[in-house]
């Protein structure tokens, strides 16, 4: 009699929010490279439609939320993790990303990102590499209830290197994706 061993494989799905709407966005292309190079067992789902979201307004969210907001919430709720890939605009995160986080934070206490591991990476053509956008996105996501994974920390200046082809930068970025995918929240002893 032969024994068969079954290996259980799990897939971790990461919803990716790109903070730029530009057609040839560096961060959109970066998200696509990360998706294509995702580690085995990790699926990066780039969430489109952020441009279709109206600015968050609680009056719009009473009753029937806009279709774009419902679609965003469903995609993120279905994911295991969230990754923001964002540039920096005028020293902060882009309004489109902030607006998406606002929609995902509601209903209060039960939004699609509440308790969900959340990481932030990005590239920007500034000398500071998007550090301020990174900090603002981390703060906003954390206040909205996400579990920010602090070890997912890559803000890169696109002035220094080609972030889409530089092996060291791509290694740090794919490492950040691996860290986010492998993150296990600390459990408290009862």
What are the language-model segments listed below?
Residues 9-42:
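N-terminal beta1-alpha1 ligand-phosphate binding loop
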Residues 2-6, 10, 147-190:
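Glycine-rich phosphate/pyrophosphate-binding loop and the adjoining helix
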Residues 64-144:
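Helix-loop-strand module that forms the ligand-binding subsite of alpha/beta enzymes
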Residues 21-22, 51, 60, 108, ...:
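Short, glycine/serine-rich, charged loops/turns that create anion-binding
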Residues 41-51, 55, 147-156:
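Short beta-strand elements in bilobed, periplasmic/extracellular small-molecule ligand-binding domains
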Residues 14, 27, 31, 53, ...:
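A general structural signal for well-ordered alpha-helical segments in protein cores
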